[in-house]
Every structure is written in structure tokens, then in C-alpha cells.
Swiss-Prot record:
GO MF term set: DNA binding; protein heterodimerization activity; structural constituent of chromatin
Subcellular location: Nucleus; Chromosome
The protein's name in its UniProt record: Histone H3 type 1
Main location: nucleus
Pfam families membership: Histone
Source species of the chain: Chlamydomonas reinhardtii (Chlamydomonas smithii)
Modification type N6-methyllysine: residues: K5, K10, K28, K36, K37
Gene Ontology CC: one annotated term: nucleosome
Keyword terms, alphabetized: Acetylation, Chromosome, DNA-binding, Methylation, Nucleosome core, Nucleus, Phosphoprotein
Keyword Metal-binding: no
Modification N6-acetyllysine, positions: K10, K15, K19, K24, K28
Length: 135
């Protein structure tokens, strides 16, 4: 901000009478009409907290029922009226999540190698190409 010069003002006399101290309730409400601004963390703080949380835990990240519907939908293309044991669907989900976690780790390394912190589709493509999954 640009600095501005202060102009001299004529005083109107002696000291003004002292005001009474405000009550605690009046002091706590802000001067902007009593609407308190909600607390917000800085960008990236919550993301880092989530990363640490999910790295510590071992539970499945994808919800079970949507994954089961996806498995059944894909299986319909190969054979109709297929039945799945619940353990088979859980095994598929474990394998799928392990694969995705590994892929995202490699993708992140590709992004870091390109001096970026944001992963992009080209990072996933490069990671898969290096792995030999996609020519």
C-alpha cells in the first residue's frame, strides 16, 4: 500500500471520558456484525493429513458394494449368471487396490522426476510403459 501524509488536526479540548470495559460476551463477537468466519486450514495441510492417515491404515479404501457391482458388471461381458463367493470379491478388491497404490507410487515418482508435484495422465502412461504393461 502507498503511504499517505497525515494532516494536522485541531484538537477539541481535554481528554474524552473513559468508556466502561466491554463485557466478555461483547468482546468475543467480532465487530463485523457477529458473524464468525469458519476456520480453514492452509492449502495442502488436510491433504498431507489424509496421506499420513491412509499410509498408516490397512483397511480397503474403495467401498465394498460399489466394487462388487463393478466386478459383476465386468463379469457379465464374459459369462452370464456368474456367482461370486464373498471372499473372491474381497480378494479381487485387495489385488485391485494393491495394484492402484503401486501405480500411483510410480506415477508420483514420474511427476517428481519431471520436477512437478502434481500427477498427470502422462505420468501414469509413463509408469505403465516402464513397467511393460503398455507398449
Amino acid at each position: 500500500m502507498a503511504r499517505t501524509k497525515q494532516t494536522a488536526r485541531k484538537s477539541t479540548g481535554g481528554k474524552a471520558p473513559r468508556k466502561q470495559l466491554a463485557t466478555k460476551a461483547a468482546r468475543k463477537t467480532p465487530a463485523t456484525g457477529g458473524v464468525k468466519k469458519p476456520h480453514r486450514y492452509r492449502p495442502g495441510t488436510v491433504a498431507l493429513r489424509e496421506i499420513r492417515k491412509y499410509q498408516k491404515s490397512t483397511e480397503l479404501v474403495i467401498r465394498k458394494l460399489p466394487f462388487q457391482r463393478l466386478v459383476r458388471e465386468i463379469a457379465q461381458d464374459f459369462k452370464t449368471d456368474l456367482r461370486f463367493q464373498s471372499q473372491a470379491v474381497l480378494a479381487l478388491q485387495e489385488a485391485a487396490e494393491a495394484y492402484l497404490v503401486g501405480l500411483f507410487e510410480d506415477t508420483n515418482l514420474c511427476a517428481i522426476h519431471a520436477k512437478r508435484v502434481t500427477i498427470m495422465p502422462k505420468d501414469i502412461q509413463l509408469a505403465r510403459r516402464i513397467r511393460g504393461e503398455r507398449a
